[in-house]
Design a protein with these regions (language model features):
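A short acidic/basic microdomain associated with nuclease active sites
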Residues: 17-32
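Anionic group-transfer/hydrolysis microenvironments
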Residues: 29, 40, 52-54
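Residue-level signal for short segments within beta-strands and strand-turn junctions
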Residues: 41-43, 55, 103-105
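Active-site beta-strand-loop-beta-strand hairpin of nuclease catalytic cores
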Residues: 37-50
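Non-catalytic C-terminal interaction segments of nucleic acid-processing enzymes
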Residues: 1-7, 11-19, 95-172
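Active-site-adjacent loop/helix micro-motif of nuclease/hydrolase catalytic cores
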Residues: 48-52, 57-70, 90-93
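Nucleic-acid nuclease catalytic cores
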Residues: 74-108
Length: 172
């Protein structure tokens, strides 16, 4: 069994929904009066989709104990999907009936994704307002800058390590 990471699923699901056409932000946990969600996707139409990413049965079971059941009290979410590796298909009884299921399979070329079950559309859904979309896009750009800062920090550490290694080689 080829283990699939959360990060691999995030990037594949973002490509699947079309990150060139949608606002897609990972790890929404504040600022929108919304429960935590792994990926929030806002389509050109203004409707939102939540994608929960689960890579283990224990993570999936723990999700059922959170109490919010992935229901947006403000009806901004049109659909809910759970993205799971193919080796977790035997755990779908923990996924709410109204949720769609995306299954990811790792192969030599990357990850394939298929829809095991389509999500039920929230009939009371409403579009995100321009202000809400701007706030979500702002959260997404904050993620980018934090990621760049982390990458730069790693680059500095690597450069320092290379200099130290060269110094060690000169000593011997």
């Amino acid at each position: 069994m080829n283990k699939i990471t959360t990060s691999e699923i995030e990037t594949r699901v973002a490509a699947f929904f079309g990150y060139r056409e949608c606002i897609i932000v990972p790890n929404i946990s504040w600022g929108m009066n919304l429960h935590e969600c792994d990926l929030l996707i806002i389509r050109k139409s203004g409707y939102g989709i939540e994608v929960e990413i689960k890579v283990s049965k224990s993570d999936l079971k723990a999700d059922t104990k959170k109490g919010h059941n992935h229901i947006d009290r403000l009806d901004r979410l049109s659909e809910l999907y759970f993205a799971i590796p193919d080796y977790m298909k035997d755990c779908i009884e923990y996924i709410p009936e109204r949720a769609g299921i995306l299954v990811l399979i790792k192969n030599d070329w990357g990850l394939n994704i298929s829809i095991l079950r389509k999500a039920q559309v929230n009939k009371n859904r409403r579009k995100f307002t321009d202000e809400e979309m701007l706030k979500i896009a702002h959260l997404g750009t904050m993620r980018i800058w934090n990621l760049k800062r982390t990458i730069n920090s790693y680059h500095r550490k690597l450069r320092k390590k290379k200099v130290e290694d060269k110094m060690q080689q000169k000593l011997f």
